[in-house]
């Protein structure tokens, strides 16, 4: 069959031949079952299944006493693919991906903050209650905003994506400001008890900027001197050129006949 490996399909035939040749004492116990239900012989490769994006929403229905849970399915557009990409696994998308992309596009510096990605048991998410943004045992980060926004979309009736984003973002800003105040107060209390701190990040950055500016000034002076030397090589020294221009009119006047 060329590139197809049919060894697994011939397991019943191989077992019978080995028993007849005396390689095995008794036929395997599964020999009758495989004879009745042989392995499937499918040589046609099917295309990968398309994954749909399912959203859970809580909506108020007219005439109903309580909001109803509704599931919205976003149909994925099927595009024509190349023959080499036809059987590749399809991309799996979740609603959190869009929320995460939107948040980090508006807050790119959140990606620069150190993050702890190690979990103690692998099931830490089961202890989190995203009805509030701050969770015990978890540092506040962009993922907290994403999960809080998703909880609002899934549990608050008629909640829109922009409104949930504004609510989660407002809570995030308030907690970030609280962390900054606590950090500043802790530093002031430590200084009051005799602690000394080094230079701040702003002071270090200003010093590096000043050093770079001084190096640039030295480079600019050397470049200016080099440019003047190149100009003097073609035209001559500036003071000599000015003296020659002043002498030429005098020589012209003396050359005129009396």
UniProtKB/Swiss-Prot annotation:
Subunit structure: Component of the mitochondrial small ribosomal subunit.
Lineage, uppermost ranks: Eukaryota, Fungi, Dikarya, Ascomycota, Pezizomycotina
GO cellular component terms attached to this protein's record: mitochondrial small ribosomal subunit
Subcellular location: Mitochondrion
Name under which the protein is recorded: Small ribosomal subunit protein mS23
Pfam family, one: MRP-S25
Keywords attached to this entry: Mitochondrion, Ribonucleoprotein, Ribosomal protein
Similarity section: Belongs to the mitochondrion-specific ribosomal protein mS23 family.
Stored InterPro entries: Ribosomal_mS23_fun
Disulfide bonds: none
Organism: Aspergillus clavatus (strain ATCC 1007 / CBS 513.65 / DSM 816 / NCTC 3887 / NRRL 1 / QM 1276 / 107)
Main localization category: mitochondrion
